[in-house]
């Protein structure tokens, strides 16, 4: 039986993630973990997060779990969710916060105002004026389409263009385009899923994304990177 540690550093919807994983993978041993040795002993790790980045990084550091997360990222399947995905990068514009630096790149805020139907730079002259386009609110909240930019085992059984549930004001901007495995449009086309080696991370919430979110968690449990 695979043991999956959900990292509990005090800033995340850990119980919702645990319930979704239990539903998606009833054969797995799901544990909410707040001690380094529990994370070290697990076969797989889910790293969720929600809230302000300065608070998330502070509580992760104060909890004593940072090194365990870094060890997991270097050695076993790890899935980041929402702020857990963002924390994998080098820094965040939110409070100019240093992050884990596992992936190259930064976390940026949606620049306001946002408008629907993002426009490519070479088409800007022909684009309708902003007043004629739908104004988008920040935070980005609700269902949105994910375009799979490259194949990955965690996309197995999930159609390209599937909608997932988002709640966020910031998004990851990888320095290495090869990290991106999913993109979503919200005024700007932004990276919403990244993958490299034994790590897969998403900006959206699989636990709030109905059957396809559960399938993503199931795929993570079955994944052999």
From Swiss-Prot:
Reactions mediated catalytically: 5-[(5-phospho-1-deoxy-D-ribulos-1-ylimino)methylamino]-1-(5-phospho-beta-D-ribosyl)imidazole-4-carboxamide + L-glutamine = D-erythro-1-(imidazol-4-yl)glycerol 3-phosphate + 5-amino-1-(5-phospho-beta-D-ribosyl)imidazole-4-carboxamide + L-glutamate + H(+); L-glutamine + H2O = L-glutamate + NH4(+)
Positions of the catalytic residues: 82, 205, 207
GO biological process terms on file: L-histidine biosynthetic process
Subcellular location: Cytoplasm
Pathway field: Amino-acid biosynthesis; L-histidine biosynthesis; L-histidine from 5-phospho-alpha-D-ribose 1-diphosphate: step 5/9
EC number: 4.3.2.10, 3.5.1.2
Keyword annotations: Amino-acid biosynthesis, Cytoplasm, Glutamine amidotransferase, Histidine biosynthesis, Hydrolase, Lyase
Span of domain Glutamine amidotransferase type-1: 3-225
One GO location term (cellular component): cytoplasm
InterPro entries assigned to the protein according to its UniProt record, in alphabetical order: Class_I_gatase-like, GATASE, Imidazole-glycPsynth_HisH
One example GO MF annotation: lyase activity
Subunit structure: Heterodimer of HisH and HisF.
Stated role: IGPS catalyzes the conversion of PRFAR and glutamine to IGP, AICAR and glutamate. The HisH subunit catalyzes the hydrolysis of glutamine to glutamate and ammonia as part of the synthesis of IGP and AICAR. The resulting ammonia molecule is channeled to the active site of HisF.
Protein name as it appears in the record: Imidazole glycerol phosphate synthase subunit HisH
Higher taxonomy: Bacteria, Pseudomonadati, Pseudomonadota, Betaproteobacteria, Burkholderiales
